[in-house]
Amino acid sequence: MLITRLRVPTIKRPLLPITSHLVRHCIRTYVATNHGNVRPFITPYKSSLPVRCLIAQRHIRTFPSNDKFTTKASNIETILLRKNNEREFKQSLLADAKNFQERFKINLKWILIKNNRPFSLNEISIIASWLILSQILWLILSTTTFISFYLFVINSVFSQEYIHEKKIYERLLKWLLKDHKCSNQDLEITFSPEDKASMLVLSPDWESNSILIKRLNVRDEILDLDLKFHHINLNVSLKNWLLGRGLITNVSIYGIRGCLNLSNFINLVNSFQGDQKTENFLKTLNNVEITDSEILLKQSLSAQETPSLKFSIYNLSLPRLRLNHFISDILSAKTFSGSINNSLFNLFKRQQKLTAVIENNNKNRMASSKFDFTDNNQENYRTVTHQDDPNYVTTLRLNFININDLKFNGNGKFNWLKDGQVEILADIMLTNSTSHLSSESKYAVVDLKVTCRDLKTTFPQEPPVLSTGDSIVSLDELKPIITFINSYEGMANPILKDFSENERLTNSIIWNSPNVSINRQRKSYPLTTKVTSNSTKEIIKFHNQPNTNANEIVLRCKMVKNLSDLQLININQILDQITMELYVDLTKIVEDWEFKNKNDWMKQWGTTFASQLLLFGFGAMV
């Protein structure tokens, strides 16, 4: 076999980046085309090149001298030479650069056009279009980061004194609210930083990826609104705005202080539902948090002389807040705790003690149901399991609070109540708003329990009326209710609570009732004993206080409301319905009390009449 010595191409030292896998690929291609016949290797010439390049040179010399392989090898060599020349040219330019700006300009041009020549018109248009598209894409995907970046630029370029002097951020917020139908010239938006030279009132919060607003003051004389916010964290999303969900997604408010007219606030929230600009910003909020806030609520339009209601919010966390489902979303809160005139209230999920038993009952009910719980009927399965889900029932509890604080006796519904305390406990079941049911099938069931203690009444000049002006009961129908409450309050007074209260007992109404009897309890030791060294009183006392709170009237009612009726905040309509239910339950209690008193009187009269007949009969016989 004749072995022909080929002319081996000289591999220069700058061509070191050539890799062995390219050579192996060429060898595999040659072997496949020649059916495995490979020419023997020829000993390479002596060279000072590295071992890797020598191996590559050895493989190249073994290839046949056909035109296809020669063209491919020459193309590879040309590409490698061009890249090496470009790299050497860039290194020479960087070496000649005098400062950082020139080096940055060279590197930037090399990334964009691989040269140091001036930009052409086509290249400038391409770069500008890519910059605009990237900014739009950034604005859609991460709106909060986009706005935070430009806020950072503004705060870095301009001084804070200049920003406060020109009121840049105040004008920006007023411009966002200028098209709202309830906004007017009386709305004042200001910032009150502690140090105007250093305080950033509007700045990015990089840790929480939100926009931070500090020391915001909002005041409106027509709406009777004056609120101060310590700081607010906002998250915005242009993507949600394009989908019709609103621009603002998450809101965290800390430290609200000020006063607010409740009637005007309700009208303001109701007006938001018909305003397109407001819905563009606040249609659906995914997460709302309010912490450490205290607001003085004015309950009437002319509430300057009347005392305000101190409403405190310790912690409020809403997974979602929608303008058209404001009440239902508030009642579906994860956490809602606070106080009303120092009376604590809390909204929480009801805890089931017999969860396992309830789950078994649900399974048995679903097994006996007419629905076929297969993969084809997943909607029916979700419907039944949701209706039987006990965790969806929330409980609202308000501790005992004076009725004068809630203004029950000043709105005309309970104008015959003078004093007392009320405790409210409500179990609320809400239909899942995300279910496939129609809007007519979504409802809210409220099981209300009102506990009244130490009630004091007075006979009014006018009968109680609803907010619409309709009469609830007449004055004649109100008389037995007032008599029952006064008698009930007198019957439940602690008898002989202390020897110093004898004067109070002599004027009590219980001594004017013929059906009152005193049942003394047995002697007992006090729970706690306080004895001083110079005390002459006895340690053991007679305790005649009742063990239970007998001076309590418990009213219960159940109310069913369609969720479509709760889209607008109509407090008067809800209170009117609750008032009617409470009056019905109170009337039943009074009727039972009258029936019991009548039976007791009949028994006593019959016993007295029979005893008199017996005495007169024995006297006649004698």
Swiss-Prot record:
GO cellular component: mitochondrial inner membrane
Residues annotated as transit peptide in the record: 1-70
Residue spans crossing the bilayer: 124-144, 602-622
Single biological process term from Gene Ontology: mitochondrion organization
Pfam families tied to this protein: MDM31_MDM32
Membrane-related topology note: Multi-pass membrane protein
Record key words, sorted: Membrane, Mitochondrion, Mitochondrion inner membrane, Transit peptide, Transmembrane, Transmembrane helix
Residue ranges that the UniProt entry lists as topological domain Mitochondrial matrix: 71-123
Domain of life: Eukaryota
InterPro entries xref list: Mdm31/Mdm32
Compartment annotation: Mitochondrion inner membrane
Mitochondrial intermembrane topological domain: 145-601
Role played: Involved in the organization of the mitochondrial membranes and the global structure of the mitochondria. Also required for mitochondrial distribution and mobility as well as for the maintenance of mitochondrial DNA nucleoids structures.
Quaternary state and interactors: Interacts with MDM31. Participates in a complex of about 175 kDa.
Family: Belongs to the MDM31/MDM32 family.
Protein name: Mitochondrial distribution and morphology protein 32
